[in-house]
Amino acid sequence: MHARHAAVTATTESPCMASLMNRVETLRWDDHRYYHQCRINQTLHLVSAISFLVAYAWLLIDPAVSALIGWCVGMVTRQSGHIFFEPRGYDQVNGASDAHKEAIKVGYNMRRKALLIGVWLALPLLLWASPGLFGLITPGAGGYLHDLGLLWLALGVGGLLFRSVHLCFLRSPMWALAWALKILSDPFHNVAIYWRSPFALLRGERLDPIEAGHAPRSA
């Protein structure tokens, strides 16, 4: 009975949905093998993923606090792993130079991340200098941090939408949707594949023994 149900499900699965999920898996695998070889980086991504899951839950309570958690904990730990610990230079595992990996990066490569982080760092200063952001917003009753959280939330949503629309023209709407889905589901996926990384790091394993063509196990 179960086999029959699985067969029916497989035959009735939308080709469009299958194509979308294949793209998501391709993006996930390329992201892992190219940019997450260091166990320290993986561990920081685990911390980041957990904080983003907390931020997701806090969206229902207070979106401003959710954004503060996501940016100050999630993004700081995530990008620290990339900037300070992930190997740069020639990638022996995948046979690719750092310049090549930066050029083919679907989402935010280091140059685009630098621009995004620059805006993120500038917003607190701008809001401090002008609580009304030079007439663009009305200061809320929640105070400086609450307004900052809402601005950072707008920045995060805007960054996701901007790159998604950009990818519609660079690649296709399907790739844009796949990237957006991959980004939004990254916290769940990162927990699934990186929960072992702290234990591997404690054993002295600094680099993940990644094999080209083999995706990481999630359980």
What are these regions (language model features)?
Residues A3-A6:
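Short hydrophobic alpha-helical segments enriched in small aliphatic residues
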Residues T26-Y56, K101-I117:
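Membrane interfacial helix-start motif at the N-side
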Residues I61-E86, G158-L170:
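Hydrophobic alpha-helical membrane-embedded segments
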Residues V54-I69, L125-L150:
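Helix-coil boundary and interhelical linker segments in multi-pass alpha-helical membrane proteins
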Residues N109-L133, A192-F199:
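C-terminal halves and exits of single transmembrane alpha-helices
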Residues V119-G140, G204-H214:
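Alpha-helical transmembrane segments and their membrane-interface junctions
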Residues D147-C168, P187:
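Alpha-helical membrane-embedded segments
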Residues S14-H32, I83-G107, V165-A219:
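Membrane-proximal soluble regions of multi-pass membrane proteins
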